[in-house]
Amino acid sequence: MKATAALVAATLLLAVTLFHRAERNPISRSCEGANCVVDLTRCEYGDVTDFFGRKVCAKGPGDKCGGPYELHGKCGVGMDCRCGLCSGCSLHNLQCFFFEGGLPSSC
C-alpha cells in the first residue's frame, strides 16, 4: 500500500513539474492571438511548420536556425541547418550560402 501511494505521489509530482515548465516556456507563449498571424505570401524563402505545428516563414541562406524547440527557426527547401546557420541554396529564389566550418560535429 505504501509503495502504491509513493508511486502515485511521484507520478503527480512529475506531472505538476512538467506542466509548470511548459507554462513557463517563453517559446510556447510567444505566439498568442494576433501575434500568430503570419502573412505567408511575404515569406522570401517559403514557409515551414514550426515545432508547435504553426506555419511560419522559413529561414534563408546564412540565417540563424535550429536551437531548442527550433527557437531560431527552420531552413527553407534546399537548405539544412548546420552549426546554427542555414546552409545550401534556397529553391525559392536560388540564393546560396555554404557553411565552411567542416562537419557539423566541429561547430
Curated annotation (Swiss-Prot):
GO terms for molecular function: hormone activity. It comes from the Eukaryota. Gene3D superfamilies: 4.10.40.20. GO terms for biological process: neuropeptide signaling pathway. This is Neuroparsin-A. Residues 23-24 form a propeptide. Keywords: Disulfide bond, Hormone, Neuropeptide, Signal. The keyword Cell cycle does not apply. Neurosparins are multifunctional neurohormones: they inhibit the effects of juvenile hormone, stimulate fluid reabsorption of isolated recta and induces an increase in hemolymph lipid and trehalose levels. Residues 1-22 form the signal peptide. Pfam families: Neuroparsin. Homodimer; disulfide-linked.
